[in-house]
Every structure is written in C-alpha cells, then in structure tokens.
C-alpha cells in the first residue's frame, strides 16, 4: 500500500463520511456542456438520422456525426450553430434572471438565494427606511437545495417578495 492511497482513504474517512459528500466533491471537478450545446447536438444527431432514413440506407459510423465535433475540453460537444438561444426561449427571462442571478450553490448542497428586500406593508412599496443611500437592503434565503420549502420560498419572494405566486400542490 502506497502512502498516497493511505492519505486518500484517511481524507475520505475524516472529511467525506457520507456517499453524497464524495458525489459533491466529484461535481466540483466536472465540466458540463452548456444547454445550448446539448440542444444543438441532439438536433444535429436527429437531422443526420432523418436524412439517412429518407435515403433508405444505414449511416456509417464516421459520417453519422460529421457536423458534431468534440471541443478541446473533451466533455463539451460543439456544433456549427454556436449562437442559438433556442434552449433559453422557453424561460421567462426576467423572472429567471432575478431568481438565479444572486444564487450560490455550495458543493455540499447548501443554496443561498440573495434578493432585494421589499417592505411587507399594505401599500407594497419598496423599503422606506433610511438605509444609507436609499438603497434597499438585501435579504437572503439559505438552506438545502433538496428542501422544496427553500426553493418555493425563494420563488415566492422572487415574484414580488410579498405575495405567494406558486400554485398550490394537491
């Protein structure tokens, strides 16, 4: 047994006692493809398969993915259509930007949503207290990303910070 494997096992014993801790440690080292790249690859593969089926022949391995190439990173795939935003068109851009702009996700699954605080008064106006240079203070929501109550609270606060905009689950 080499000394490096002893150190690795000791580190895992002391610092990564649960299986999901090891998973989070591996996530920190992953390089993931952007959603646009994944969508473009899927579309390119469907187009190649459809063209081959129309011609009535089976595709050869070398020509099936001729318009899809691997990037230098090795994990992300690229296509000739680099500036497509089809993936993002299905989102409400302003709401999603407000929700995810201040979000921080740590490797242990703790998420922090930072948002602009609003006064919960009847008039629904912005925070009217004297906060220095009339800037609204920031509120944060912190908790486990796997706890649905945390994400629901962040979503509700994102949509006005004073009204619940989520549909009731039944």
Curated annotation (Swiss-Prot):
UniProt subunit comment: The APC/C is composed of at least 13 subunits that stay tightly associated throughout the cell cycle: APC1, APC2, APC4, APC5, APC9, APC11, CDC16, CDC23, CDC26, CDC27, DOC1, MND2 and SWM1. SWM1 interacts directly with CDC23 and APC5, and is required to tether APC9, CDC16, CDC26 and CDC27 to the complex.
Ranges of Basic and acidic residues composition bias in the record: 48-67, 132-141
Disulfide cross-links: none
Assigned protein family: Belongs to the APC13 family.
Pathway(s) where this gene product acts: Protein modification; protein ubiquitination
Region (Disordered): 48-81, 122-141
Species per Swiss-Prot/TrEMBL record: Saccharomyces cerevisiae (strain ATCC 204508 / S288c) (Baker's yeast)
Protein's job: Component of the anaphase promoting complex/cyclosome (APC/C), a cell cycle-regulated E3 ubiquitin-protein ligase complex that controls progression through mitosis and the G1 phase of the cell cycle. The APC/C is thought to confer substrate specificity and, in the presence of ubiquitin-conjugating E2 enzymes, it catalyzes the formation of protein-ubiquitin conjugates that are subsequently degraded by the 26S proteasome.
Name of the gene encoding the protein in the UniProt record: SWM1
Listed InterPro entries: Apc13
Protein's GO biological process: anaphase-promoting complex assembly; anaphase-promoting complex-dependent catabolic process; ascospore wall assembly; cell division; protein ubiquitination; regulation of meiotic cell cycle; regulation of mitotic cell cycle; regulation of mitotic metaphase/anaphase transition
Name this protein carries in UniProt: Anaphase-promoting complex subunit SWM1
Keyword Kinase among UniProt keywords: no
Keyword terms of this UniProt record: Cell cycle, Cell division, Meiosis, Mitosis, Ubl conjugation pathway
Lineage: superkingdom: Eukaryota
């Amino acid at each position: 047994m080499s000394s490096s494997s002893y150190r690795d096992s000791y580190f895992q014993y002391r610092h990564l006692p649960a299986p999901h801790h090891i998973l989070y440690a591996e996530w920190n080292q992953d390089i993931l493809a952007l959603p646009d790249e994944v969508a473009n690859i899927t579309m390119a593969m469907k187009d190649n398969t459809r063209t081959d089926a129309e011609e009535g022949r089976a595709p050869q391995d070398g020509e099936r993915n001729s318009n899809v190439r691997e990037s230098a990173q090795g994990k992300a795939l690229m296509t000739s259509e680099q500036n497509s935003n089809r993936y993002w068109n299905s989102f409400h851009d302003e709401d999603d930007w407000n929700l995810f702009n201040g979000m921080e996700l740590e490797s242990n699954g703790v998420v922090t949503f930072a948002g602009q605080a609003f006064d919960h008064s009847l008039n629904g106006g912005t925070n009217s207290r004297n906060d220095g240079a009339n800037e609204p203070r920031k509120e944060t929501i912190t908790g486990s990303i796997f706890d649905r109550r945390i994400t629901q609270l962040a979503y509700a606060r994102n949509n006005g910070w004073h009204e619940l905009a989520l549909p009731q689950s039944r």
